Amino acid sequence: MPVVAVIDYEMGNLHSVCKGLEKAGATPIITHCHQELTKADAVILPGVGAFDPAVQSLRSRDLEQPIKDTIASGKPFLGICLGLQILFESSAEGNQPGLGIIKGKVRRFVWEPGITIPHMGWNQLELTQPKSILWEHLPPQPWVYFVHSYYVDPFEPQVRAATVTHGTQTVTAAIAHENLMAVQFHPEKSSNIGLQILSNFVSQVREKIAA
């Protein structure tokens, strides 16, 4: 089975991500060791919490460069929730620079009548890259589970793989560019749809190994 390294920097619900990967047919290893990232067939960067502590935690474990090297190598990489946001250059939530792997900023939802912040619960995706491997075998507007007050705003709109609408605000819900994929929602909390997304990621890992 493909080995997927799940980065542990004390900012994620790693157990449920790992359970989802096991159901998807992968062997997850929880690690903050860059040698393990190098050996793994793919890497996942999960994350819940605040932007500044997350990037500080990654940097204190000397994980910034290994993450950049992993993505540059062409190895399949998936960011989840905060693990999407810290790939960007900066966030309205904090003062620390992000990893800057994707050009753009993290912005906060603007309050408007009839919505709650954080955006929490089930919502439908609008697939802007419908042919992305992440969305294989999914219905056209799948329901997934969100918990976030901030969203990513990529400088290059073509990296968007899906959007979501909260109130009148339509924002990026996922990005995909070559081997780099990341989602704002929680696939591990998104029932069968989320499991299919993780399975699609693992399928891509298998294809990469076979090649």
Curated annotation (Swiss-Prot):
It catalyses: 5-[(5-phospho-1-deoxy-D-ribulos-1-ylimino)methylamino]-1-(5-phospho-beta-D-ribosyl)imidazole-4-carboxamide + L-glutamine = D-erythro-1-(imidazol-4-yl)glycerol 3-phosphate + 5-amino-1-(5-phospho-beta-D-ribosyl)imidazole-4-carboxamide + L-glutamate + H(+); L-glutamine + H2O = L-glutamate + NH4(+). Residues 3-211 form the Glutamine amidotransferase type-1 domain. GO terms for biological process: L-histidine biosynthetic process. Pathway: Amino-acid biosynthesis; L-histidine biosynthesis; L-histidine from 5-phospho-alpha-D-ribose 1-diphosphate: step 5/9. Its main location: cytoplasm. Pfam families: GATase. Coiled coil: none annotated. InterPro entries: Class_I_gatase-like, GATASE, Imidazole-glycPsynth_HisH. It comes from the Bacteria. Its EC number is 4.3.2.10, 3.5.1.2. The active site is at C81, H186, E188. PROSITE patterns: GATASE_TYPE_1 (PS51273). It is found in: Cytoplasm. One of its GO terms (molecular function) is lyase activity. Keywords: Amino-acid biosynthesis, Cytoplasm, Glutamine amidotransferase, Histidine biosynthesis, Hydrolase, Lyase. One of its GO terms (cellular component) is cytoplasm. Heterodimer of HisH and HisF. NCBIfam families: IMP_synth_hisH (TIGR01855). IGPS catalyzes the conversion of PRFAR and glutamine to IGP, AICAR and glutamate. The HisH subunit catalyzes the hydrolysis of glutamine to glutamate and ammonia as part of the synthesis of IGP and AICAR. The resulting ammonia molecule is channeled to the active site of HisF. This is Imidazole glycerol phosphate synthase subunit HisH. It comes from Nostoc sp. (strain PCC 7120 / SAG 25.82 / UTEX 2576).
